[in-house]
Amino acid sequence: MHQQPRSPAPAASTSSARRSQDYDRRSDSPAFDLRTHTNRGLGIETENDTAEPEQSSQPGPEAISKVNQIVTNYHTKAALIILHSRVELPPSYAKNSNVPRVNRWFNVELEETDALKDQLKTWRTCDATDNRPPPMIIETYLDTAGLTNNQTLVALDDNGKRWDVTESLAASQSSRPAKASSSRAVDVILERWRVELGDMPGKLPSDLGAILPTVYKKSIILFRSLFTYSKFLPAWKFIKRNGRSRAHPALRVKYRIFSGHARDLSKQDHLTMPLFEGDTKVVDTYSFGVTDSPAGPFSVQVTYRTCCDFRVDDSEALLSSQFMGADDEIFQPSLPSGGLDARVTPEVGSAPLTRRTVEDPDLSRAYGSLSTFHHVGPTTGASPISALRAAREARASSPSPPTSSHRNSFAAARASPVGRAATLANDTNPNVARRPSISFQPFKAPPLSASPSLVDPPLSASPRTTGAGRTSLSDSRHMPPPSVTTSSRKPPSFGPDNANSSPNSASPRPTPMSRYSSAFSHRRGRPSSGGINKLEDDNSSGRASATSSGAQPGSGLLAEITGTSSDSIHADDENISEFLKMLDLRKDLLSPSSQTAMDNHSRRMTAASAALSRFRGMKDSNAALSDSMSSSLLMNRSSATSSKQLSGVPGIAGTSISTASSPGGKAISPHTPHTPAIPSRLSSNSIVDNTTTRLHGDNGSPVEEDASDETTTERLPSTVTAIPIPTSPATIFPSTFRRSSSAANRRSSHAIDDDEIFTMRSVSLGAEEPSHTTLGALQRQQDYEPIGTNIAPLESGARSSGGDDGNVLRGPTRRGPGAHRDASLSGPTVATSPYSHHPLHQRRISHSRGRGFSGGPHSLSSGSSSIARGGLIHPYPAEREAERDANAGASHSGTEDRRGTGRGSGGGRHNLPQAAQVEEDEPLLFAMSDFGASRRSFEEGRQGNHGPDSSGNTGSSRRGSGKRGTLSGFHLWP
């Protein structure tokens, strides 16, 4: 009837609440996994479910072995990479193989070595759990134990100063209370590498096998960075520099590997000791980062010296340099300050006082062309034109007067012409006088690009004053005229402005002014003579003077405070601007507007080219004609006049010379003929005929020769080359008969002239004694001697083309102007000259016959000679002398017969007896062509007129009888 308590119900509820709390607690733990507890939803519990999480937290032995391999190779690979880049390690080979073993861990292939086996034994036997590796320290250092007593290891700082390393380390050790061992005192540590494995955070995870591939990939990046960066450090550069050269053994880098716990690095450290004084850092540190792994974080760090410039020097030399203070600082002379320069007042002729430091260079002291611009100070990249323009604008915009004490160095700079060193202009005093320029001529003959001036002005010249305007004519200096070579090498340039008066010329000489300047404007030629002025001195090329050029540093020449004018620079700058504007305005000049204009231009160019080619072809003939005319004009003068007017030609009368010499003006040698290439009729007195009589009849074979023929004629053996147009000795012809119409009138010959001329003989003519009695003296001597008349008939026939008397009278001559004009022509007699067989005369002709008589036998003949034209050479010397006498005397008559008189012959010289031949060839002492009223032209004379002579033979004239008539028909002048 009353209720009973229910005990089972609360018990069941308590049991379910306990299960729900246990489920919630397991789900919050990281080891709980829903996939392994799917069967718990039914409330079924087993004992195996509670032991499963403890078994899955332990990794397998295979995964632990892989972790240990990574830790071991992590240390050994780092040591191999570091030491391979610092020292030479011997490779290790496999058994029975010559191929070295290669370490391919972390995708960096390096040769294995057994040299590090003992030193790396600690890190080869370590593991990640029980025997963890200590930090590995690798040091590279220099060992000074190998130095001798007179050798010292020195370190060079950034300024190149030498420091004794041993003394520096000893000084650093004495400043600290703790001292290192003596064995470490001689070591200079370059680098210190630290490879370390950090502490492991906890137990190894159960899924260690899945994490290891990711750790390996991260390590590849680390070791590749280590391999690359190890070759960027200063120690590697020092090793490579010594490896290329045979360095001292003390400079070879050594290494050591030790554990990080072996010593306390807080004590004395040689790596951080400074070796020399300075503000730079002694050491620097670089870290390659941290690579996470299940065994702990991997890290690599390097501490290195920033300066690794070492060398071995002699101890005594280093000590003496320290005593002398040569390495303390670079010697710098004391320089005046800017205020001192402003207070200094220049004096006339004083030494240069303005000096500029390198920090404040004078921009006008630049040299070079427009394309190569060199500064005194640091390079600013400014071209010379822009620098000059900036200087001009600065002067124009400067409000301060020119007499201000403080001047801007750039505004006060007066730039000289491009290519020359300039001087600092002085505007404070307009009346400051300039010192005379002192030019240097280092070369005898300057090359094409030589800049020194060819003319040196006198050192005693008065200084020129430079004012605001141009230099007046009265203040200009004068200089002596240069030589002929200088004037020919540097032609004068003319300008529109200032003309300077010269003491050697009456007319003023213009100063050189150019339309516009270029890169070679500093090489403009200077006038050959006359004075110079300031503008000319400024424009002169390469005048190394104290006023117009500023010396470069170290040359010994200092710049001087002068009033150099810059008008020439401004004018050049303005001319360049105007020229560029003109090119912009007249662009049609470069590009023709139409095709017609282009065709016209091409036709004009073609015509001009054709004309130029034609005139070039005429150049040689015109030059030869000019030389022939000059030779004909100059050969009739005396030796004194000829030697003065011809440069390099000795005055030797009777020598066949011409002015057709080389352009260089070298002297004409008497060994080589210098005759005109073109026949000239300017002077008949300088042409003679030494040939035999032309034969045009029945008596024998004629020897016909034209005056215009070439020299390639048949001749007998002779050592002298035939010359087409030779000239004859001046003493053969009398001075009283000269043609008034001749272009070159022969001057009167005197005995003293003849003696001087014929005694001037070439050395090559031999050692025979010359005759002191000349032909002219013998000719005048026979005028005073009794002359015997020896009449002989002339077998050569009549010498007229009009049928007149065919015999020619060679009458006696008497002294006086009218001696030849009064000669009788009516009788068939010939006067024999008493000097024709004179021994002196024979020897003179013999000399000319044998050795070329100052030009050969052709010097006595204009057309042909007795040797070259078939003349018979007598076998006996006496007969040969007689023939030469006859040839020398009859040359003049033969010449005049060719020029205007008809001449015939009944027989040649070969057909005559020797006695008659000698008498026939007696010389005529008068010029037949001088009696003619006029001359026939060259064309009419070449046609020739023929007429019968008195002996019945047909005589021919080379150039016709003309208006002169025959010999018997001459009208004698009173």
Swiss-Prot record:
Keyword Cytoplasm: yes
Bias kind Basic residues: ranges: 838-850
Main location: cytoplasm
Biased composition (Polar residues): 462-474, 681-694, 826-835
Region ranges (Disordered): 1-63, 389-561, 642-749, 790-871, 883-974
Biased composition regions of type Low complexity, renumbered to the chain: 1-18, 403-422, 498-508, 541-551, 856-871, 950-974
Residue stretches of biased makeup (Basic and acidic residues): 19-28
Superkingdom as given in the UniProt entry: Eukaryota
Keyword annotations from UniProtKB, A to Z: Autophagy, Cytoplasm, Protein transport, Transport
One Pfam family cited in the UniProt record for this chain: ATG13
GO biological process: mitophagy; piecemeal microautophagy of the nucleus; protein localization to phagophore assembly site; protein transport
Cellular compartments annotated: Cytoplasm; Preautophagosomal structure
GO CC terms, sorted: Atg1/ULK1 kinase complex; autophagosome; cytosol; phagophore assembly site
GO molecular function, one term: protein kinase regulator activity
InterPro entries: ATG13, Atg13_N, HORMA_dom_sf
Function according to Swiss-Prot or TrEMBL: Activates the atg1 kinase in a nutritional condition dependent manner through the TOR pathway, leading to autophagy. Also involved in cytoplasm to vacuole transport (Cvt) and more specifically in Cvt vesicle formation. Seems to play a role in the switching machinery regulating the conversion between the Cvt pathway and autophagy. Finally, atg13 is also required for glycogen storage during stationary phase.
Quaternary structure, from the entry: Interacts with atg1 to form the atg1-atg13 kinase complex.
Family: Belongs to the ATG13 family. Fungi subfamily.
Name of this chain's protein: Autophagy-related protein 13
Species, as recorded: Emericella nidulans (strain FGSC A4 / ATCC 38163 / CBS 112.46 / NRRL 194 / M139) (Aspergillus nidulans)
Lineage: Eukaryota, Fungi, Dikarya, Ascomycota, Pezizomycotina
Encoding gene per record: atg13
